Design a protein with these regions (language model features):
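Bacterial Sec-dependent N-terminal signal peptides
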Residues: 1-28
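N-terminal pre-domain/capping segments
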Residues: 2, 23-138, 173
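Hydrophobic, well-ordered secondary-structure segments
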Residues: 55, 154-157, 175
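Acidic/histidine-rich catalytic cores of soluble enzymes
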Residues: 69-70, 166-183
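Surface-exposed cleft-lining segments at the edges of enzyme active sites
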Residues: 114-116, 144-153, 179-183
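A short small-residue
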Residues: 136-146
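Active-site cleft segment of glycoside hydrolase catalytic domains centered on the general acid/base Glu
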Residues: 147-168
Length: 183
């Protein structure tokens, strides 16, 4: 009787403990998706057409640290960090990371704010969205806009951001606005 009880207790303990070891191994082997905003390392790679550096070693170092995706922060004149969208995507993917998103934006001119007609700025966005699509971006985030001085300017900016969002959606890209404390 004691032998049967001992055997039963051992089997119960083993079956209770076994899954923990399997879960621990699976958890250890799982790779997490962690992205980095390249604005965080702008001093190393340059940004917005200034102080351009070879960003490939920085991308490699970030991938080696375990990052799996990036958010660009240097879209300028149809390029990312001085490279075509296709070149930029290739360079990021070459180190095993994914191009996920980008921070970029274009404020409205005084004339556009006064008239409420932002069709000229939307031409810029047409090129911008096409470049982001070519780079493989899933998201575009506008990180900053000037603080509107009047309620009318605020409404114009709301209409503007909604128009950008609509164009992005039509291109299969998600769009957002990254607010700050001053807004």
């Amino acid at each position: 009787m004691k032998r049967k009880l001992f055997t039963a207790v051992c089997i119960l303990l083993a079956s209770a403990i076994a899954p923990y070891g399997a879960f621990a191994k699976a958890k250890k082997d799982a790779k997490k998706d962690i992205g980095i905003q390249l604005y965080s390392v702008r001093d190393l790679i340059g940004s917005f057409g200034r102080n351009q550096h070879d960003y490939k070693p920085v991308l490699k170092a970030l991938a080696d640290m375990g990052y799996t995706s990036i958010e660009a922060a240097s879209y300028n004149d149809g390029k990312f960090y001085g490279n075509t969208p296709e070149e930029f995507r290739r360079d990021v993917e070459a180190v095993g990371m994914k191009v996920l998103s980008s921070h970029c934006g274009k404020g409205l001119s005084d004339e556009e704010l006064a008239s409420g007609d932002f069709s000229e700025s939307m031409k810029w966005w047409d090129q911008c969205i096409a470049a982001h699509k070519a780079a493989g971006m899933e998201y575009i985030v506008t990180p900053y806009l000037p603080v509107p001085k009047t309620l009318k300017e605020m409404q114009t900016y709301c209409d503007y951001l909604n128009a950008i969002g609509k164009k992005c959606r039509e291109a299969g890209i998600k769009y957002g606005y990254h607010n700050h404390a001053h807004e």
